[in-house]
A protein has these predicted regions:
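Amphipathic alpha-helical transducer elements in NTP-driven molecular machines
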Residues: 18-21, 51, 55-58, 62, ...
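Canonical P-loop GTPase G-domain recognition
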Residues: 99-102, 109-171
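P-loop NTP-binding site
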Residues: 171-283
Length: 283
């Protein structure tokens, strides 16, 4: 949804919940407004130190924004996780500035009108929302409506970013996220949460013709167990090659230059619970 609002890919996409690891800013420029979207990890009941730190990140973000968008997929029933988030948002509203919350029924294109109506009713009963809006990032349905609603809750003030800037994400972070997105494609349930990606270096050089600019990108993929390492690498390295091919195309499109992508998979046992490992990985 962030990508649909910005009009360009600034955040990775995965069908797995709880795979966002840091806040991602996407910037929407309009003649009369500038919308800075802060895409955060989802609030959840943490089971690891990483989960606790991500929750702290989200709660800190909630104190800094002017309006909150709470996404509830239309193809899933409102469940305990949604109720937990609704309670956390209500607590934040009581303790803070009373920041308005817009409930967003995402993936509206995946359900019929009757199912969507049921979902919107369930959302309305979940909390006291400033607005409720169904959207589809895939088809663009009501993305413009959501944009106008979010802008309506913004205070007047100067633009925070220059025209044309779509994100303030460091390039290395975006590269790492694109590799992680490719690695998450089609993996089993437990692996997404155990995978971390770190860019070691990005070194410019010229290609073999001596003229074409290139970039050598060295990336490490960390997992928690040897069995997970085997999944990422695949038989004879086939899966890791596929990950590299997919990620390389995305990274070249992002950077506008050819790259040589060097991927290495390492085991960092229980890194999600290890403060030192978390620090090394930027958490």
């Amino acid at each position: 949804l962030t990508n649909a609002l910005v009009g360009q890919k600034v955040a990775i996409m995965s069908a797995r919940p709880q795979t966002t690891r840091h806040t991602i800013r996407g910037i929407v420029h309009r003649p009369d407004a500038q919308l800075v979207l802060v895409d955060t990890p989802g609030l959840h009941r943490p089971r690891t130190l990483l989960g606790e730190r991500l929750n702290e990140l989200v709660k800190g973000t909630l104190t800094e924004v002017d309006v909150v968008g709470f996404c509830l997929p239309s193809d899933q029933k409102v469940g305990p996780g949604d109720r937990f988030i609704a309670e956390q948002l209500a607590d934040a509203a009581r303790d803070g500035r009373g920041t308005p919350v817009v409930a967003i029924a995402t993936k509206a294109d995946l359900v019929g009108k009757a199912r969507l109506a049921e979902h919107l009713l369930a959302i309305s009963q979940l909390g006291d929302w400033a607005d409720i809006v169904p959207v589809s990032a895939e088809t663009g349905y009501q993305v413009d409506v959501l944009e106008k609603i979010l802008i309506s809750h913004l205070p007047e003030g100067p633009a925070l970013y220059p025209e044309g800037e779509l994100t303030d994400e460091p390039v290395a972070v975006m590269v790492a996220e694109l590799v992680r997105e490719a690695a998450l494609e089609g993996v089993r349930d437990e692996l997404p949460h155990s995978l971390a990606v770190v860019v070691d270096e990005m070194v410019p050089r010229t290609g073999e013709d001596g003229a074409t600019p290139m970039l050598d990108v060295r990336v490490q993929l960390f997992v928690e167990r040897d069995s997970q390492k085997a999944i990422i690498i695949g038989k004879g390295g086939s899966r890791l090659r596929d990950v590299g091919t997919t990620a390389r195309k995305e990274i070249e499109a992002l950077l506008g230059t050819r790259i040589f992508l060097d991927l290495h998979v390492k085991v960092a046992k229980d890194w999600q619970r290890d403060p030192k490992q978390l620090g090394k990985m930027g958490f």
